[in-house]
């Protein structure tokens, strides 16, 4: 059974799933689609062609699906936001719709935890089980892999890719790509180590040891990172190690390393 407060505004055409809870003064636009058991809390706004998956919550005064903060945006149609199931979008977050410079959609996977005042710009692609701490700021076209964590007060430059199970520490500033399973920190942030806390939560001891060996081979040799990745990908059978190597070989923004490395 839907529970919609009498002061909430639901435009004609909006699709609201079963057991939705829409609180006072919330707004849901005509093109929005809310899954089952979705909660839109007091004063939150769901705009444009936004789709929110089952069992998700949008907290007070968050704004999901408004137009992008992009000076080249021209009132494009068929753009929007897609959010997976079990997402938590906390107070005052802003998530902008996509543009035709991407595929038109800003995407967020399942089990996202987006803390208060965070910003996700147009055309970002966010994996599943991602955490953004308070005031994390993603510029346009940023990509975060599954299980990535971005600390509070950290901005990420447009088009940057952060790999699977990465950690970007709080109060950092990131302008280059972070290899899967690694931890980056600083202003400007560079890769400091493996994200051991994160990978130990996901993988068994043998898998962690494979990643430790790969990290030492790639980053502690004082040799070209891409040369090391080419050599390692040719001889490893470990899928996680292959992900690291492939990411390095595909980067367009470069990998942030300590000074003196290339």
From Swiss-Prot:
Main location: cytoplasm
Example of a GO MF term: acyl-[acyl-carrier-protein]-UDP-N-acetylglucosamine O-acyltransferase activity
PROSITE patterns the UniProt entry points to: HEXAPEP_TRANSFERASES (PS00101)
EC number of this enzyme: 2.3.1.129
Compartments in which it is found: Cytoplasm
UniProt keyword Lipid biosynthesis, yes or no: yes
Catalytic activity: a (3R)-hydroxyacyl-[ACP] + UDP-N-acetyl-alpha-D-glucosamine = a UDP-3-O-[(3R)-3-hydroxyacyl]-N-acetyl-alpha-D-glucosamine + holo-[ACP]
CDD domains recorded: LbH_UDP-GlcNAc_AT (cd03351)
InterPro entries named among the record's database cross-references: Acetyltransf_C, Acetyltransf_C_sf, Hexapep, Hexapep_transf_CS, Lipid_A_LpxA, Trimer_LpxA-like_sf
Pathway: Glycolipid biosynthesis; lipid IV(A) biosynthesis; lipid IV(A) from (3R)-3-hydroxytetradecanoyl-[acyl-carrier-protein] and UDP-N-acetyl-alpha-D-glucosamine: step 1/6
Record keywords, A-Z: Acyltransferase, Cytoplasm, Lipid A biosynthesis, Lipid biosynthesis, Lipid metabolism, Repeat, Transferase
GO biological process: lipid A biosynthetic process
Superkingdom of source: Bacteria
Cellular component, GO, one term: membrane
Gene3D superfamilies: Hexapeptide repeat proteins, Udp N-acetylglucosamine O-acyltransferase, C-terminal domain
Role description: Involved in the biosynthesis of lipid A, a phosphorylated glycolipid that anchors the lipopolysaccharide to the outer membrane of the cell.
Subunit organization: Homotrimer.
Family classification: Belongs to the transferase hexapeptide repeat family. LpxA subfamily.
Name used for this protein in its record: Acyl-[acyl-carrier-protein]--UDP-N-acetylglucosamine O-acyltransferase
